[in-house]
Amino acid sequence: MQKADTLIHTKLRQPFTRQELVSRPRLHEQIARGLCGPLTLITAPAGFGKTTLVAAGITGPGMPVAWLSLDRNDNQVERFLRYLVAALQEVDHTIGSEASQLFLASQQAPAETVLTSLINDLDIAGRETALVLDDYQFISNQAVHEAVAFLI
């Protein structure tokens, strides 16, 4: 994988939630139910608190959470995959070891190979992990969409 200083670490951290937030138990319950399935989409206009809601809502279930805050710069599939691996390694450093080696061996590691390695590592880890792709609306590259579809 790239040197640690080439990744923006704050993109890999779940946002801090304040204690004085408005309680939204019904929405938090829906998020908790959504963790039982392979995919949960949360949509609303900009500024409606989606990130805050998810950050507050997924802290309770006890499931490890890998967080990746996306932006327009993450439309290159290689960059997206590097950040994806790093986000999962924040949860469990053993996940993505082979994928990191693939990046070191080749700057153009095939997405399917990297993702297959990640899926296998997640299976070996033996526990469910939630992955939050925050601000996914910035992703417009079909190759990144296909990578996410493969992962799901």
Language model regions located:
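P-loop (Walker A) phosphate-binding loop of NTP-binding proteins
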Residues: 45
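Walker A (P-loop) ATP-phosphate-binding motif of ABC ATPase nucleotide-binding domains
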Residues: 39
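Conserved phosphate-binding/catalytic loops and adjacent sensor/switch elements of nucleotide-binding enzymes
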Residues: 48, 52-129, 138-140
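Alpha-helical sensor/transducer elements of the RecA-like P-loop NTPase core
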Residues: 6, 10, 26-27, 52-56, ...
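Conserved catalytic network of the ASCE P-loop NTPase/AAA+ motor domain
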Residues: 33, 121-125, 151-152
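Walker B catalytic acidic pair
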Residues: 134-135
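Hydrophobic anchor at the beta1->P-loop junction of P-loop NTPases
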Residues: 42
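Conserved adenine-nucleotide phosphate-binding loops and their immediately adjacent elements
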Residues: 1-31, 97-103
